[in-house]
């Protein structure tokens, strides 16, 4: 899919009690269906947002305290993240409703005998959660699987409570094999089977192996299966599988790739992806999990390392509504969504909001459309007859 959206912003002036409708045009110029979601958000109290990254770490092991200290220097996270075995611990600063957005990591690419294939993309999961000041969250940010003659599985991205209860998990993408692409992370809890290969894990468990010696992805609770090495579950530290010189799985439970142009590794996730079979195609994508409200879940969307964004939510918006919040736009087609601005219950002043458009376009998956509205009084001009004015 290839998304095109107009307009890119709204700047409107309304009289008190006026209602105004404007159109948002969503066009798909790509060669596959475009899946999209629209969400209104209020700029009034937004801005309190915390973004957790892989701290520039790559490979099967997570970042160190020093690497994350350097990454977050000068940000709102400086001095507030403690790293233990690559897992980042953060204390919630204020009670409230938070939106947590997580992305699984991409699988590694393959290049064998002049044939190049790409790893599967990571899933995106988003939900709202009530958090308390002082509450500890454990955050594991998945890392991209290693690219070689075969690809390692991408790591899943996890957010859990201090007692290790999962809140939200985004599955990584499977590693590419010598003859085919890796399979993307999915929004369902079960990991996917590797292409003609091992079964994906279920109920938070690791995936299985098929023919060959690649490693399956791990789940939240149990490790991924492997003949050599093996990826570790979230509860066991989340290390990606890395036996010998084979392509390592990414941190977050990614399984290793195998051989020279062999099978791709399974991805980590809530449940792990399986490995590919004897056809040496791609590894399976990781499963995902979301216990939040107002969910936005999209499979196969992230082409990079994982990321976690936690945002203190703003109050609901009463003066703006959308005619549709989700849809599928076919190839070469256009969809129209109506934005209604309603100043009926507003006082004179300036109001700001935004529209977040999230899609499966890999090059432009998240678009913000700002809304600026000024409300003024409607002044009525009355003609006065000069003859009626007494001196």
Set out the residue ranges of the language-model regions.
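GGW-centered surface loops in extracellular recognition modules
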Residues: 45-108, 167, 175
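Extracellular beta-strand-rich recognition modules
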Residues: 98-104, 136-143, 169-171, 271, ...
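Secretome/extracellular-domain signature
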Residues: 119-224
């Amino acid at each position: 899919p290839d998304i095109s959206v107009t307009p890119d912003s709204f700047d409107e002036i309304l009289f008190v009690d006026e209602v105004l409708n404007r159109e948002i045009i969503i066009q798909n110029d790509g060669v596959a269906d475009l899946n999209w979601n629209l969400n209104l958000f209020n700029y009034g109290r937004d801005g309190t947002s915390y973004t957790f990254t892989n701290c520039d770490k790559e490979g099967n092991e997570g970042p160190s305290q020093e690497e994350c200290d350097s990454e977050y220097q000068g940000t709102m996270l400086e001095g507030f993240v403690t790293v233990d075995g690559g897992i980042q611990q953060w204390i919630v600063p204020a009670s409230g409703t938070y939106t947590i957005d997580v992305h699984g990591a991409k699988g590694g690419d393959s290049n064998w005998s002049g044939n190049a294939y790409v790893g599967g993309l990571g899933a995106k999961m988003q939900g709202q959660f009530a958090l308390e000041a002082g509450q500890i969250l454990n955050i594991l940010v998945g890392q991209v699987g290693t690219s070689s003659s075969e690809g390692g599985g991408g790591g899943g991205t996890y957010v859990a409570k201090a007692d290790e209860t999962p809140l939200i998990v985004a599955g990584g993408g499977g590693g590419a094999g010598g003859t085919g692409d890796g399979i993307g992370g999915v929004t369902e809890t079960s990991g996917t089977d590797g292409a003609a290969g091992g079964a994906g894990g279920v109920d938070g468990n690791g995936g299985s192996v098929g023919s060959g010696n690649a490693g399956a992805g791990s789940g939240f609770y149990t490790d991924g299966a492997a003949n050599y090495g093996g990826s570790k579950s979230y509860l066991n530290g989340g290390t990606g599988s890395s036996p010998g010189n084979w392509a390592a799985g990414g941190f977050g439970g990614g399984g290793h790739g195998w051989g020279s142009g062999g099978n791709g590794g399974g991805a980590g996730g809530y449940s792990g992806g399986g490995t590919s079979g004897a056809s040496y195609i791609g590894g399976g994508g990781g499963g995902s999990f979301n216990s939040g409200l107002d969910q936005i879940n999209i499979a196969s969307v992230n082409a990079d390392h994982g990321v976690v964004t936690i945002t203190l939510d703003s109050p609901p918006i009463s003066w703006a509504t959308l005619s549709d919040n989700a849809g599928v736009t076919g190839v070469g087609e256009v969809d129209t969504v109506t934005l209604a601005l309603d100043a009926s219950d507003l006082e004179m002043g300036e109001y700001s909001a935004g529209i977040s458009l999230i899609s499966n376009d890999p090059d432009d998956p998240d678009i913000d459309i700002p809304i600026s509205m000024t409300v003024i009084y409607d002044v009525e001009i009355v003609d006065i007859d000069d003859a009626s004015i007494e001196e």
